[in-house]
Amino acid sequence: MSKFEDIRGVAFDLDGTLVDSAPGLAAAVDMALYALELPVAGEERVITWIGNGADVLMERALTWARQERATLRKTMGKPPVDDDIPAEEQVRILRKLFDRYYGEVAEEGTFLFPHVADTLGALQAKGLPLGLVTNKPTPFVAPLLEALDIAKYFSVVIGGDDVQNKKPHPDPLLLVAERMGIAPQQMLFVGDSRNDIQAAKAAGCPSVGLTYGYNYGEAIDLSQPDVIYQSINDLLPALGLPHSENQESKND
Protein backbone atom coordinates (compact mmCIF):
# COMPACT_ATOMS: atom_id res chain seq x y z
CA MET A 1 0.00 0.00 0.00
CA SER A 2 1.46 3.34 -1.06
CA LYS A 3 2.17 5.89 1.65
CA PHE A 4 0.65 8.50 -0.66
CA GLU A 5 -2.35 6.60 -2.01
CA ASP A 6 -4.78 9.30 -0.84
CA ILE A 7 -2.90 12.18 -2.48
CA ARG A 8 -5.09 14.29 -4.78
CA GLY A 9 -2.70 17.19 -5.40
CA VAL A 10 0.97 18.14 -5.02
CA ALA A 11 2.48 21.47 -4.02
CA PHE A 12 6.12 22.48 -4.27
CA ASP A 13 8.48 24.97 -2.75
CA LEU A 14 10.48 26.92 -5.35
CA ASP A 15 13.99 27.99 -4.29
CA GLY A 16 16.16 24.99 -3.53
CA THR A 17 13.42 22.54 -4.55
CA LEU A 18 12.60 23.23 -8.19
CA VAL A 19 15.26 25.82 -8.96
CA ASP A 20 18.80 26.71 -8.04
CA SER A 21 18.28 30.43 -7.48
CA ALA A 22 21.37 31.01 -5.35
CA PRO A 23 23.51 32.56 -8.13
CA GLY A 24 20.95 35.28 -8.85
CA LEU A 25 20.06 35.91 -5.22
CA ALA A 26 23.69 36.13 -4.18
CA ALA A 27 24.54 38.50 -7.02
CA ALA A 28 21.67 40.83 -6.09
CA VAL A 29 22.53 40.73 -2.38
CA ASP A 30 26.16 41.53 -3.07
CA MET A 31 25.32 44.37 -5.44
CA ALA A 32 23.00 45.86 -2.82
CA LEU A 33 25.65 45.57 -0.09
CA TYR A 34 28.29 47.07 -2.37
CA ALA A 35 26.01 50.01 -3.15
CA LEU A 36 25.91 50.75 0.59
CA GLU A 37 29.70 50.42 0.83
CA LEU A 38 29.41 47.25 2.90
CA PRO A 39 31.39 44.00 2.52
CA VAL A 40 29.99 41.55 -0.02
CA ALA A 41 29.02 38.09 1.18
CA GLY A 42 29.44 35.65 -1.71
CA GLU A 43 27.16 32.84 -2.86
CA GLU A 44 28.30 30.21 -0.35
CA ARG A 45 27.30 32.43 2.56
CA VAL A 46 24.10 33.79 1.00
CA ILE A 47 22.84 30.22 0.50
CA THR A 48 22.65 29.86 4.29
CA TRP A 49 20.34 32.90 4.48
CA ILE A 50 17.77 31.79 1.88
CA GLY A 51 14.30 30.54 2.76
CA ASN A 52 12.41 33.07 4.86
CA GLY A 53 11.65 35.73 2.26
CA ALA A 54 13.45 38.83 1.07
CA ASP A 55 13.01 40.93 4.22
CA VAL A 56 14.66 38.31 6.41
CA LEU A 57 17.34 37.81 3.76
CA MET A 58 18.13 41.53 3.97
CA GLU A 59 18.25 41.44 7.77
CA ARG A 60 20.68 38.53 7.72
CA ALA A 61 22.82 40.16 5.06
CA LEU A 62 23.00 43.49 6.89
CA THR A 63 23.75 41.90 10.26
CA TRP A 64 26.62 39.92 8.75
CA ALA A 65 27.96 42.85 6.69
CA ARG A 66 28.05 45.23 9.64
CA GLN A 67 29.82 42.67 11.79
CA GLU A 68 32.25 41.87 8.98
CA ARG A 69 33.01 45.55 8.45
CA ALA A 70 33.67 46.03 12.17
CA THR A 71 36.00 43.03 12.22
CA LEU A 72 37.91 44.21 9.16
CA ARG A 73 38.33 47.72 10.53
CA LYS A 74 39.54 46.39 13.87
CA THR A 75 42.05 44.14 12.11
CA MET A 76 43.38 47.15 10.20
CA GLY A 77 43.56 49.26 13.35
CA LYS A 78 40.79 51.59 12.20
CA PRO A 79 38.07 52.97 14.49
CA PRO A 80 34.55 51.53 14.23
CA VAL A 81 31.99 53.23 12.00
CA ASP A 82 29.13 55.01 13.69
CA ASP A 83 26.19 54.49 11.34
CA ASP A 84 24.05 57.56 10.88
CA ILE A 85 21.24 55.37 9.53
CA PRO A 86 19.42 53.06 12.00
CA ALA A 87 19.60 49.38 11.13
CA GLU A 88 15.85 49.21 10.39
CA GLU A 89 16.13 51.99 7.83
CA GLN A 90 19.24 50.43 6.33
CA VAL A 91 17.35 47.14 5.89
CA ARG A 92 14.60 49.03 4.05
CA ILE A 93 17.13 50.71 1.75
CA LEU A 94 18.93 47.41 1.19
CA ARG A 95 15.64 45.74 0.24
CA LYS A 96 14.87 48.42 -2.35
CA LEU A 97 18.33 47.99 -3.85
CA PHE A 98 18.00 44.20 -3.78
CA ASP A 99 14.64 44.29 -5.57
CA ARG A 100 16.11 46.47 -8.31
CA TYR A 101 19.18 44.31 -8.83
CA TYR A 102 17.35 41.00 -8.51
CA GLY A 103 14.93 42.10 -11.20
CA GLU A 104 17.95 42.46 -13.47
CA VAL A 105 19.66 39.14 -12.70
CA ALA A 106 16.90 36.75 -11.55
CA GLU A 107 16.31 34.98 -14.85
CA GLU A 108 19.96 34.54 -15.85
CA GLY A 109 20.88 33.54 -12.30
CA THR A 110 18.26 30.82 -11.81
CA PHE A 111 18.33 27.25 -13.14
CA LEU A 112 16.05 24.23 -13.00
CA PHE A 113 17.38 21.34 -10.97
CA PRO A 114 17.67 18.01 -12.86
CA HIS A 115 14.42 16.14 -13.64
CA VAL A 116 12.13 19.00 -12.57
CA ALA A 117 10.34 19.58 -15.88
CA ASP A 118 9.90 15.84 -16.56
CA THR A 119 8.52 15.27 -13.08
CA LEU A 120 6.07 18.17 -13.23
CA GLY A 121 4.92 17.07 -16.67
CA ALA A 122 4.35 13.48 -15.56
CA LEU A 123 2.36 14.56 -12.50
CA GLN A 124 0.24 16.92 -14.56
CA ALA A 125 -0.39 14.21 -17.16
CA LYS A 126 -1.62 11.95 -14.36
CA GLY A 127 -4.29 14.57 -13.65
CA LEU A 128 -2.91 15.82 -10.35
CA PRO A 129 -3.33 19.56 -9.74
CA LEU A 130 0.01 21.17 -8.94
CA GLY A 131 0.66 24.17 -6.72
CA LEU A 132 3.63 26.36 -5.91
CA VAL A 133 4.26 27.91 -2.49
CA THR A 134 7.21 30.25 -2.15
CA ASN A 135 8.33 32.97 0.25
CA LYS A 136 9.92 34.77 -2.71
CA PRO A 137 8.39 38.23 -3.33
CA THR A 138 5.36 37.71 -5.55
CA PRO A 139 6.37 40.10 -8.40
CA PHE A 140 9.39 37.94 -9.19
CA VAL A 141 7.57 34.60 -9.24
CA ALA A 142 5.48 34.60 -12.44
CA PRO A 143 8.21 36.01 -14.72
CA LEU A 144 10.67 33.45 -13.38
CA LEU A 145 8.28 30.53 -13.93
CA GLU A 146 7.61 31.73 -17.47
CA ALA A 147 11.32 32.15 -18.24
CA LEU A 148 12.00 28.60 -17.03
CA ASP A 149 8.96 27.28 -18.97
CA ILE A 150 7.31 25.68 -15.94
CA ALA A 151 4.44 28.13 -15.33
CA LYS A 152 2.20 25.90 -17.46
CA TYR A 153 2.28 23.13 -14.87
CA PHE A 154 0.79 25.05 -11.93
CA SER A 155 -2.88 25.69 -11.30
CA VAL A 156 -2.19 27.59 -8.06
CA VAL A 157 0.78 29.85 -7.28
CA ILE A 158 1.24 31.55 -3.91
CA GLY A 159 4.08 34.05 -3.52
CA GLY A 160 5.46 35.65 -0.41
CA ASP A 161 3.24 38.73 -0.71
CA ASP A 162 0.01 36.78 -1.24
CA VAL A 163 -0.45 35.82 2.41
CA GLN A 164 0.08 37.62 5.68
CA ASN A 165 1.99 34.71 7.19
CA LYS A 166 4.75 33.05 5.18
CA LYS A 167 6.14 29.55 5.67
CA PRO A 168 6.77 28.00 8.20
CA HIS A 169 3.23 29.20 9.01
CA PRO A 170 0.64 26.82 7.52
CA ASP A 171 -1.49 29.54 5.89
CA PRO A 172 0.08 29.37 2.40
CA LEU A 173 -0.35 25.60 2.22
CA LEU A 174 -3.89 25.73 3.53
CA LEU A 175 -4.72 28.34 0.88
CA VAL A 176 -3.34 26.16 -1.91
CA ALA A 177 -5.30 23.12 -0.73
CA GLU A 178 -8.45 25.23 -0.53
CA ARG A 179 -7.98 26.50 -4.08
CA MET A 180 -7.35 22.96 -5.28
CA GLY A 181 -10.60 21.90 -3.62
CA ILE A 182 -8.96 19.19 -1.54
CA ALA A 183 -8.29 18.59 2.15
CA PRO A 184 -4.79 19.42 3.46
CA GLN A 185 -4.13 15.74 4.17
CA GLN A 186 -4.76 15.03 0.47
CA MET A 187 -2.06 17.48 -0.66
CA LEU A 188 1.57 16.38 -0.69
CA PHE A 189 4.06 19.17 -0.06
CA VAL A 190 7.58 18.88 -1.43
CA GLY A 191 10.38 21.07 -0.10
CA ASP A 192 14.04 21.25 0.80
CA SER A 193 14.11 23.10 4.12
CA ARG A 194 13.05 23.14 7.73
CA ASN A 195 10.50 25.87 6.93
CA ASP A 196 8.84 23.67 4.31
CA ILE A 197 8.49 20.64 6.57
CA GLN A 198 7.30 22.70 9.53
CA ALA A 199 4.66 24.35 7.34
CA ALA A 200 3.48 20.97 6.05
CA LYS A 201 3.22 19.53 9.55
CA ALA A 202 1.32 22.57 10.81
CA ALA A 203 -1.09 22.39 7.87
CA GLY A 204 -1.64 18.65 8.21
CA CYS A 205 -0.08 17.87 4.82
CA PRO A 206 2.15 14.85 4.20
CA SER A 207 5.63 16.00 3.27
CA VAL A 208 8.63 15.07 1.16
CA GLY A 209 12.04 16.45 2.06
CA LEU A 210 14.67 16.71 -0.65
CA THR A 211 18.31 16.32 0.32
CA TYR A 212 19.61 19.06 -1.98
CA GLY A 213 18.74 22.74 -1.81
CA TYR A 214 19.05 25.34 0.92
CA ASN A 215 18.47 24.27 4.51
CA TYR A 216 20.75 26.48 6.60
CA GLY A 217 23.42 23.78 6.54
CA GLU A 218 21.14 21.26 8.25
CA ALA A 219 20.33 17.76 7.03
CA ILE A 220 16.67 17.60 5.99
CA ASP A 221 16.09 14.44 8.04
CA LEU A 222 16.39 16.55 11.21
CA SER A 223 13.04 18.12 10.28
CA GLN A 224 11.45 14.65 10.05
CA PRO A 225 9.54 14.82 6.76
CA ASP A 226 7.35 11.82 6.01
CA VAL A 227 9.68 10.74 3.20
CA ILE A 228 13.16 11.82 2.12
CA TYR A 229 14.28 11.70 -1.53
CA GLN A 230 17.59 12.54 -3.17
CA SER A 231 16.01 13.43 -6.50
CA ILE A 232 12.68 15.03 -7.30
CA ASN A 233 11.74 12.30 -9.78
CA ASP A 234 11.72 9.78 -6.93
CA LEU A 235 8.22 11.18 -6.39
CA LEU A 236 6.92 9.44 -9.47
CA PRO A 237 7.01 5.80 -8.30
CA ALA A 238 5.58 6.87 -4.94
CA LEU A 239 2.58 8.29 -6.79
CA GLY A 240 2.16 5.32 -9.11
CA LEU A 241 4.14 6.60 -12.09
CA PRO A 242 7.25 5.26 -13.85
CA HIS A 243 10.55 6.66 -12.65
CA SER A 244 11.85 9.19 -15.17
CA GLU A 245 15.38 8.49 -16.36
CA ASN A 246 15.51 11.49 -18.67
CA GLN A 247 18.45 13.73 -17.89
CA GLU A 248 18.05 17.48 -17.83
CA SER A 249 21.00 19.80 -17.95
CA LYS A 250 21.07 22.44 -15.24
CA ASN A 251 21.63 24.97 -17.96
CA ASP A 252 18.80 23.88 -20.26
From Swiss-Prot:
HAMAP family: GPH_hydrolase_bact. It comes from Escherichia coli O157:H7. Pfam families: Hydrolase. The active site is at residue 13. Monomer. NCBIfam families: HAD-SF-IA-v1, HAD-SF-IA-v3, PGP_bact, PRK13222.1-1, PRK13222.1-2, PRK13222.1-4. InterPro entries: HAD-like_hydrolase_sf (IPR050155), HAD-like_sf (IPR036412), HAD-SF_hydro_IA (IPR006439), HAD_sf (IPR023214), PGP-like_dom2 (IPR023198), PGPase_prok (IPR037512). Keywords: Carbohydrate metabolism, Chloride, Hydrolase, Magnesium, Metal-binding. Its EC number is 3.1.3.18. Pathway: Organic acid metabolism; glycolate biosynthesis; glycolate from 2-phosphoglycolate: step 1/1. This is Phosphoglycolate phosphatase. The gene is gph. GO terms for cellular component: cytosol. GO terms for molecular function: metal ion binding; phosphoglycolate phosphatase activity. Belongs to the HAD-like hydrolase superfamily. CbbY/CbbZ/Gph/YieH family. Mg(2+) binds at residues 13, 15, 192. One of its GO terms (biological process) is glycolate biosynthetic process.
